[in-house]
Amino acid sequence: MKHLKQLRERYFSTLKHSDTEETIDLWFYRPIGFLVALLGERLNLTPNAITTAGIVLGIASGLLMFPASLKLNLIGFLLLVLADVCDSADGQLARMTKSYSTLGRILDGVSSDIWFASIYLCIALRFYPEWGIGIWALTIGAAVSHAIQAAMADHYRQFHLFFVNGKGGSELDDSESVAHDYRSISFKAEPVRKLSLWFYWHYTKVQETFNPQMTRLRVCLRLQSGESLSPTISELVGHATLP
């Protein structure tokens, strides 16, 4: 009984915040992700390893959307669900083991974009013989709007967590800081990190471009009090930014 209580407490410690957790996550993805995170901890896996596994599963899911076979398509859908489980488990493992890294944040940010690029591309190729060039216009429009929506949802979520949990409980970054990190390293010395930071830099710029008021608010607050926010400000802005 005591062990179950400890396990339950540990599970809840891997969640971000009740304000930002979606119903399907709480009932499905988080519990399964927690089991995967426990397995990863036992096997000494890093959160980035689980993220990479999710990327592979997501790409495979897209490839299985290409054949006109319901059986293969259903397998592809199952792989997409497993990729989503990995997307949950990597963050849970990071919070469980306190294994945070900029590279992990970058990989986590672009992983779902890579899956859906694979899915959109393979679906477009599947329907091209019947739809012709029009399928590409539809696919590009859907992919771009999807990417922007996902980036905005992530930004609003992290912005809210910044005021509710503080800097340590949020993954909110700004493009200037990311750009500084990007320029501080050479491609020759750290090619993977350099390339990852380039993508993440532009990802944060897109977020700030579509949310200029939030960016200005954070800059003003930083000029006044740095990253340490007063309880009053945290409560007011946290309430105003509820999802």
Listing of model-derived features with the role each one plays in the protein:
Residues 1-32, 158-243:
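C-terminal membrane-associated helical module and adjoining short loops/tails
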Residues 8-17, 34-44, 70-73, 96-104, ...:
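Short juxtamembrane and helix-loop transition motifs at transmembrane-helix boundaries
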Residues 47-103, 120, 137-144:
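Membrane-embedded alpha-helical segments that form the functional core of polytopic membrane enzymes
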Residues 47-52, 108-116, 235-243:
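Select subsegments of transmembrane alpha-helices in polytopic membrane proteins
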Residues 56, 60, 107-122, 166-177:
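Small-residue-rich segments of transmembrane alpha-helices in multi-pass membrane proteins
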Residues 91-133:
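Basic, amphipathic juxtamembrane/active-site segments
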Residues 93-102, 154-164:
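A cytosolic-side transmembrane-helix exit/cap motif
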